[in-house]
């Protein structure tokens, strides 16, 4: 079951968001370091999903920019509001195709309605 993986992701996300005010606004790790950390061969056997999520969070840590934090003034990329983050998680979970109504009626309808606000 994926519950443990989702709980692990939620715990890492919560910890990240709670620490935004204290996080460095510039990622301390460079491209080479991140490639070395995140690269390498794929596992030959299945892995525990929760362990994969935890490992990803650990390896990506030095390459994360605190763009949603209160001290970030680099680019106007905005921050992720809690409701938007949760909605994004649901959208990824539902995995709907908004291209055709028959493939994802709710997603297609939300996409059509969002055009009103553009």
Regions found by a protein language model. Give the residues of each.
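Conserved small/polar residues in nucleotide/adenosyl-binding loops
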Residues: 116-118
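Conserved pre-motif C helix in the palm subdomain of viral-like polymerases
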Residues: 102-109, 113
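Glycine- and acidic
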Residues: 94-102
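N-terminal glycine-rich, Lys/His-bearing helix-loop that initiates the first secondary-structure elements
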Residues: 1-90, 106
């Amino acid at each position: 079951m994926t519950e443990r993986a989702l709980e692990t992701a939620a715990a890492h996300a919560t910890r990240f968001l709670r620490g935004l005010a204290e996080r460095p606004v510039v990622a301390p790790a460079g491209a080479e370091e991140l490639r070395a950390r995140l690269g390498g061969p794929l596992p030959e056997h299945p892995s525990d999903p929760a362990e994969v999520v935890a490992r990803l969070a650990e390896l990506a840590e030095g390459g994360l920019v605190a763009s949603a934090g209160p001290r970030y003034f680099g680019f106007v990329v905005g921050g992720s509001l809690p409701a938007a983050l949760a909605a994004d998680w649901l959208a990824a979970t539902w995995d709907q195709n908004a291209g055709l109504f028959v493939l994802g009626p709710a997603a297609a309808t939300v996409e059509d309605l969002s055009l009103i606000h553009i």
